[in-house]
Each structure stands twice: as C-alpha cells, then as structure tokens.
Regions:
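Post-signal-peptide, soluble extracytosolic/periplasmic N-terminal scaffold domains
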Residues: 5, 26-287, 596-663, 673, ...
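A short, amphipathic beta-strand motif
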Residues: 68, 293-295, 682-686, 760-770
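Short Pro-Gly-centered beta-turn/loop motif in secreted/extracellular proteins
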Residues: 88-97, 327-332, 708-734, 746, ...
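Extracellular beta-sheet/turn segments enriched in Thr/Pro/Gly and aliphatic residues
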Residues: 144-148, 357-361, 674, 738-759, ...
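Feature captures outer-membrane beta-barrel proteins of Gram-negative bacteria and organelles
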Residues: 167, 197-208, 231-247, 383-405, ...
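Transmembrane beta-barrel strands of outer-membrane/channel proteins
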Residues: 178-182, 214-218, 253-259, 369-373, ...
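Short, acidic Ser/Thr/Gly-rich low-complexity loop/linker segments typical of extracellular
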Residues: 699-708, 785-796
C-alpha cells in the first residue's frame, strides 16, 4: 500500500514538473535543471526523489492518452502512448512507438518493411534509430504527441485526405435506404383520378471490409375514371452484389451483378467479378468525373434518370431550372432523363456521360478488369463468358497511353488511344476502337460477320485568364458495321440487328464567370445521330446575374433556355426570373414560355434556420389562373419534399417525396435522412443522451432516445468531421468532447463516441471510513463509466452530470477503490452546498486509503475553487491546459476540467 501511496504522490508531481519543463526555455537545451523541493506541499517530501525530473525531456513512465500530430497534422483519434525506461538509461524515459501507432504515421510501405523493432517487456517498440530524422516530442500541456517525420518517408497526403493506413472499415451492421415518390392528380375535364407511387433503394450488410448489397425498385400506378379502373404494379430486385476496397492496389473488388465500368467501352449489365482502380482513393485534386444533368421543369415535377431501362436516380424538383450533380460515376454510356410534370406533360432527353480520359501521372498505371456473363434485367444470361481489361499508363509528364480489349466467343473489340496535356492549349485525347461481331445463324441471323471502327476525340481547356472552361467531351464517329458490346447484346436479346445504332455522338460544355460583373454563363450541347433513325439532341443555356439596384442589394436575374429533340419530337422552352430580397426571404417573378404555352408567376420563397425551404407562386397561363407550392424539409429521420399544383379548369395535383434510411449496428442504430443509397455513413453515440444536435458537412440532426444518430452526408476516403452544437445542447447536458473525425472506406458504417453527460452540477466531499480522503487526482465516475470530476485536496470534487439515486465510484491506482451513493432526490438547498459523501471501500480493496497528499500550490492541474462563509461554491476555471496523468497499472486518463 505504501508503494501505491508514493505513486499517487508522484503523479501530480510528475505532471506539474512536466508542465514546468515544457514551458521552460531550458527544456530545449541539454542542461539539467535543479529544483527546490520546498515548493512541494506534500508529506514526506524528503522521501520524494525528483532528480529524474531535472533531465531534459523526462516523462514519468506509463501510458498517456494523447492526440497525435504528425508534421502539424492531427490524426482523427487519440492513442494510448507508452513511455518506457530504456535499458541503457535506468533514470531516463522514451516513447515506445508500438505497431498500432506506427501504422498510422503513413510511412511508405517499402520503408515500413525495413523498420527495426525492440522489445520492452511485452511491448514491441520502434527502435529510435529506425528512421533517421524521426523525432517524438511530448506536449503534455495540450495532451499531444508531436511527431516529426521527413516528408520523403511519408505517403502522399492532403489537407482533407489520409493515406490508406488511416482508413477505417467501420463496424458491422445492416442498412436499408429508400427513396419513395407519391403523386396524386385529379383531371377536372375528365374527372379521372390518378395515383403513382414509385420507389427504389438498397438493402445491405457490412462485415469487416465487405459490403453486401441488394438494390430494389418498385412502382404502383392506379387510374380511376368513368369508363374503367386500371392498376399496374411491379417490384423487383435489380442487383445483388458485394464489394470491398483493396487499399494496397488502390482498387475496388466487386462480386455479383454489376455494370461494366470503362473509359473506352460502353457499359452493360453482367454477373461476375471486377477489379477497378478507384479514383475515390486518390486525393481530391486527382479524382475523376461524374455526369451532370441540367434541365427546366415547367411545373413541380418528378425527374427520373434511367440507364438501359432501369431507374438510377429519382427526385422531386420545384418549377424552374434544376441541376443534378450527385449521380454515381460508375455508369458510362447514355443516360435517359424523364421529367414528369404535375400538369401531366412529360419531357424526355438523353445525356451522354463521356468525359476527357484521365491523364495518368508519370510512371503510374490505372486499370479496370472484369470477368463474367452478360445478363438481362431478369437475371437471365444473354451470352457466354466475357472478359475485359483496360489500362492507362503515364508515359511521361502530361502524356498517357491507354487502351483495352473486350470479348466473348462471338464478339471481340480492341481500343487504343493517347492523351496529351498540351499546356496552355488544353488537354486532348484520341482513340480508335475496332470490333468484330459474328452473328450465328441459330439466333435468326444469316451467319454474317460485321467489322467496323469507331473513332473518338476529346478536348478540354481551362481559360484561367477569363475564368472559364471548355470541354468537348467525346466526339465519336462509328462506321455502320461497328458494334459495341451493348449493341451486340441487344441483337442477341431481340434476335435482330438494331437498324438505328449510333453513328455520331458528341457533347460540348462551356462555363464562363464574370466575377467583377457578378455574372456567370453555362452552356451544354449534346447530339447523337443514327444510321437509320432520327437524330437526337439537347442543349441548355443558362445566364445568371447578381447585382444591386440603388439601395436594394443582392438582386438576382436569370435566363434559361433549352431545346430537346427526341424520337422526332422537338421541345423548346425559355425560363426567366427576377428575385428581390425581402428580409431573409425573397419575392420573385418567373416566366415560362414553351411553344404556344406560357406562364407568368409572382412568387414568395424563404427558408428557416433549421434548413427548411418553401416556395409559393400564383400566376396566369393560357388555361387561366394557376398556383403552386413547394416545401422541402431535412428532418432527423427523413428528407421530405411536398408539392401542390392547381390550374383553373384543368387539374389539381399533390406530390410527396421521402428519402431516408435505417442503420442498425452492434453499437446501436437509428433512422436517418437519406443520401446516396448504400453509401458511407457515420453512427455517433452520445452515451444515451437524447436530442443532442450533431452535424457533419450538411444540416444538423439530433440523437434519438437511445443517444444515437446517423450522419449520412459523409464522404469516402476523405476526412470527415462530426461535431456537437454546444449552443443547442439539452438542458443540464455537457459535452467534454464535441468534435470527432474519421476517414471511412466506401460504404462503411463508421462509429464515433462523444463524451456527453447529463445531470446536475454540485460540489461534493468524499470521505473514507477512517476519516481520510481519496488521493488527489482520483477520478469520479458514474455507472456508465463516464468521468464526472476529479478529487482535489481534502476530498473536494466539483461534479457535473450527476443524477439523484445513482452510485458513484472513485478510481485511483487504475481501479475502482470506493463507492458512494447519491440521495434519491436533489433539493435546491442540497445542490447549493457541498455534499458530504461517505465512500465505502470496495470488496478486495484495503480498508484504508493511501496517505493523502496535498496539491502543488499554484499548480495548473485542477480548477480553483473558492469558499464563502465556510461553504464551497462553484469552481472558477483556470486557463491553463491540464496534462494527462499516468496511472500505476499503465492505464492513462486525461484530467478533465472540473466545470
């Protein structure tokens, strides 16, 4: 027991001296420091040997829970760091960098394999001379371990991006994501009633690094009029698959049903396996491209994006221009867009996803490989086994070669191309694809063999001097006998050659900003021609202007025009708007002109502090009076969009969209609002405290009754932050840790814990049965093992988050030593005074506490408190940072502020 006594005495001494050293100019020198032990207010000071503390950089051996800062960059989590006694220096101490810590430093793999390890007891520690120039320094005042590591030893890192060693695969769990749209429409002329319900989403499970997924979609359509009633419904599982990250290869492995991912070949559905270089694993500056869809909705509308007949994306949009930018980049080829207006009209157009091929960095290779059987949407195979492979090689700086091959028994294609960065001229890529297709007689063909070529050129340039960008993405000319794999599979499925296969396809986009004038312009044009069917084209032009008019500030005006040509039908339209601020809201004029149809509207729009948005419009069109409204709410449980339309003498309609999900894990679960189906998310835990506001990069959400919340707006392979809004905490709740960070792999369910306590604040005095007190620095914890405070001198402790009737335990020497019970109820008088709490020694513990010690005078280890009329009052916080205290059994704890 006497040994423990001295440890309890030395802990505050060590920390106090350590802080003095860290603040002293002598700490950086090689000189020893002499101390006057008279300043120590502890018993038996003559028996305290502090000679070792006079040595430069000495830290009392033990385990400290510290933040790790590498070359100024802080790691997401705290780590237990052990200080050990070197064999060559019994009076010294040094950091034991264990393998778990070293793997987080981001050392290059070829260097990590050569590291030398030494043994300290049961611990493996990095030899101090393993890497020349590596240095560890402790900043106990800020609970931080500073690691200096030459940049040449480290993998590439970015401000918001971590190397693979720091990626987190998350925890096991089950997810269910959904996107449901419901529309009701009453036709006033015919009296018919229509209801349309559609939905899609993902069901999945996470096991280690594996993500198991099943995509679903369903629809229900009901029509009721005077003549008949019809109901159509459909439900299907469109895709079963599993995937995981391969960090060492910088790639993604996918098993099951998937879409061919390719930069040179068109996509199709198949079942099999693929290994693909994943751009998401690259730093943000080096990542790839995802398609963007722009258009104009003439009324509140539902926008569907489909590929080869399957819905990939579905959402509700208000009347006016819309832009969809959160599509998955895994699908290549042509996307079909359907805009279903609430007035019953429909727009349709195609969007090509072509982009300028990625210019690979010098000496690097990016690749994509797949093996499997093509199949239809009913999961039936179409042909035999196929294989595909493609790669891009960075030959020199700014010049890349790329190509690939794909084939099965009756179809083969090969592609070869080159990309070149031309400096101020821009970037260009050119490639050619040759195909051979054998059409066997038993499939209804005459046994002919079709051969042809397809040529493609892509160009992109940033005009920095005029703040603009031009992209000529994918002019492609295909000979009549050229067949893509997708064309070949269609021929096999429908037993005839598609007479309308593609001849030309190109997409042009241009962005221009006029920052001084507050103006911007956007233009996109895509066109497809076919050998034996009508051409298709689509263009969008958008002009925006932000300006002031006299004393009226922040006005905005926009002009949007579009034209689409699809299956021989043309659709043209113009949308103009003017918006004027009105307090925190705005009033507006909107005009929509489409052929013989026109609509003029006055509108009022606004938003609330919780992120809700609404729009109200009244106006006139060729039918008569018209009104519509739109409301969007980002709730903690789901995203909700509501819309309503009315047109005099024509129709009235209602629309609703719900997007959200459910996540269940071994650490708990929650309902939550939506993101990309099946994607990455973060489960946060606030120790059972409900209604705690937490947020990621988007709108805040709140924890449920179990103290859990899921943040859905979390990226993959990039550092994500989650934080508690301390200004909106529930009454009597306090957060001692309000910010966490994590870097998750794709599809992971991350988990982070916030230190939150809820309850009363009070001053207490802990007294043992023999009249003594728990030692200085002892921890007070509740039944959930949450730290509520620290014991100061004479058993005094300022506690936060206590609840009536609970049992508190006091810890020292690394274990719970005694416990005290709180009264069943708290009265104002009781909370206003110091409460004496008898602390009963736990079974197996000695009947008496270690000899008490007094704190260091004027030391910063604990917040000061004052007394009035002999009664303690709430402590007054000092501004000095508190270092962690090593415990005797090599467990560490951070000293928390007492209020």
């Amino acid at each position: 027991m006497m040994n423990n006594t001295w440890k309890s005495v030395l802990c505050p001494i060590a920390c106090g001296v350590g802080m003095l050293l860290s603040a002293s100019p002598y700490s950086a020198s090689g000189k020893d420091i002499e101390f006057n032990t008279d300043f120590l207010d502890v018993k038996n000071r003559d028996n305290v040997n502090i000679a070792q503390f006079s040595r430069k950089g000495f830290i009392l051996p033990g385990v400290y829970l510290l933040q790790i800062k590498i070359n100024g960059q802080t790691l997401p989590q705290e780590f237990p760091v052990n200080w050990v006694i070197p064999e060559h220096d019994p009076q010294g101490s040094e950091v034991c960098a264990e393998p778990e810590l070293v793997t987080q430093l981001g050392i290059k793999p070829e260097l990590a394999e050569k590291l030398v390890w030494i043994t300290h007891g049961e611990r493996q520690c990095l030899a101090p001379d393993s890497l020349k120039g590596m240095d560890f320094q402790a900043d106990l005042g800020h609970s931080t371990l500073l690691v200096n590591l030459p940049q040449a030893y480290m993998e590439y890192s970015d401000v918001d991006w971590d190397p693979p060693a720091r990626w987190d695969n998350g925890i096991p769990g089950i997810i269910l994501d959904y996107n449901i749209n419901n529309q009701l429409r009453h036709d006033q002329e015919s009296g018919s009633e229509e209801q349309s319900i559609s939905g899609n989403g993902t069901l999945g499970a996470n096991l280690g690094a594996w993500r198991l997924r099943a995509d679903w979609q369903a629809s229900y359509d009901h029509r009721d009029d005077d003549e008949n009633t019809s109901t159509l419904h459909d439900q299907s599982w469109s895709r079963y698959y599993a995937y995981r990250a391969l960090p060492t290869l910088g790639a993604k492995l996918t098993l099951g049903e998937s879409y061919l991912q390719s930069d040179v070949f068109d996509s199709f559905n198949y079942i099999g396996a693929s290994v693909v270089s994943d751009d998401q694993m690259l730093p943000p500056k080096l990542r790839g491209y995802a398609p963007e869809i722009v258009g104009i909705a003439r009324s509140n509308a539902k926008v569907k994006v489909s590929w080869q007949g399957r819905v990939l994306y579905e959402t509700q949009v208000p009347a006016g221009p819309f832009r969809i930018q959160d599509l998955n980049q895994s699908v290549s080829g042509t996307l079909h867009v359907t805009v279903e207006e609430q007035n019953g009209q429909t727009q349709e157009f195609d969007v090509n996803t072509a982009s300028v091929p990625f210019l690979t960095r010098p000496g690097m290779v990016r690749y994509k490989m797949a093996l499997g059987r093509p199949q239809d949407w009913d999961h039936h195979p179409i042909t035999g086994t196929f294989a595909s492979a493609e790669a891009s090689w960075g030959v020199t700086n700014g010049w890349s070669l790329y190509g690939g091959a794909i084939g099965e028994s009756n179809y083969q294609a090969v592609a070869l191309g080159s990309g070149k960065d031309l400096g101020v001229v821009g970037a260009v890529a050119v490639d050619i694809t040759h195909s051979i297709a054998h059409m066997p007689q038993d499939d209804g063909f005459d046994g002919e063999t079709l051969q042809g070529n397809s040529y493609r050129i892509s160009y992109s340039r940033d005009f920095d001097e005029i703040d603009s960008r031009l992209t000529f993405a994918g002019y492609r000319f295909s000979e009549k006998n050229f067949m893509s794999m997708s064309d070949y599979l269609d021929a096999k499925t429908y037993h005839h050659l598609n007479a309308g296969h593609e001849k030309e396809r190109y997409t042009v986009t241009y962005n221009q900003n006029f920052r001084e004038q507050g103006m911007s312009a956007y233009f996109s044009y895509s066109r497809s021609t076919f050998w034996d069917s009508p051409d298709q084209s689509n263009y969008n032009l958008s002009l925006s202007w932000y300006f002031d008019l006299g004393s009226i500030k922040n006005l905005s005006a926009s002009l949007n025009g579009y034209r689409s040509e699809y299956n021989g039908d043309k659709d043209d339209g113009v949308y103009i708007s003017l918006s004027v601020p009105w307090g925190n809201d705005s009033i507006s004029y909107n005009g929509t002109f489409n052929g013989s149809q026109h609509r003029n509207q006055l509108g009022y729009s606004g938003h609330s502090q919780n992120g809700d948005n609404w729009q109200l419009h009244v106006g006139q069109d060729e039918q008569g009076a018209q009104a519509d409204g739109y409301y969007s709410h980002q709730g903690a449980l789901t995203d909700i969009d509501l819309s309503a339309d009315y047109e005099e003498g024509s129709y009235r309609s209602l629309g609703m969209s719900l997007r959200g999900g459910m996540t269940l894990t071994t650490q708990g679960g929650a309902l939550h609002r939506g993101s990309l189906a099946g994607s990455t998310r973060l489960l946060v835990d606030t120790d059972g405290i409900a209604d705690v506001p937490v947020s990621g990069s988007g709108s805040p959400t709140s924890t449920n009754v179990f103290g859990k919340a899921v943040i859905a707006d979390v990226g993959s392979y990039s550092r994500s932050l989650a934080r508690i809004d301390l200004n909106k905490l529930p009454e009597k709740a306090e957060a001692t840790k309000s910010v966490v960070q994590i870097t998750l792999t794709e599809g992971a369910i991350g988990y982070r814990h916030f230190d939150v306590v809820s309850g009363e604040k009070m001053m207490a005095v802990f007294r043992l049965a023999d009249g003594d007190f728990p030692p200085f620095g002892a921890e007070v914890k509740n039944e959930r093992q949450q730290q509520l405070g620290l014991v100061a001198d004479d058993g005094n402790a300022w506690l936060a988050g206590v609840k009536a009737g609970e049992t508190l335990k006091v810890f020292w020497d690394g274990a719970a030593q005694c416990e005290a019970s709180l009264p069943p109820t708290f009265t104002p008088e009781l909370l206003a005074n110091a409460l004496l709490l008898p602390c009963k020694m736990l079974e197996g513990q000695p009947p008496t506490a270690p000899q008490k010690s007094s704190p260091l005078p004027a030391q910063p280890l604990i917040q000061e408190h004052t007394q009035t009329d002999g009664q303690p009052v709430a402590p007054v916080a000092t501004t000095t940072q508190t270092p962690p205290i090593p415990l005797a059994d090599n467990h560490a704890v951070n000293r928390k502020d007492m209020e």
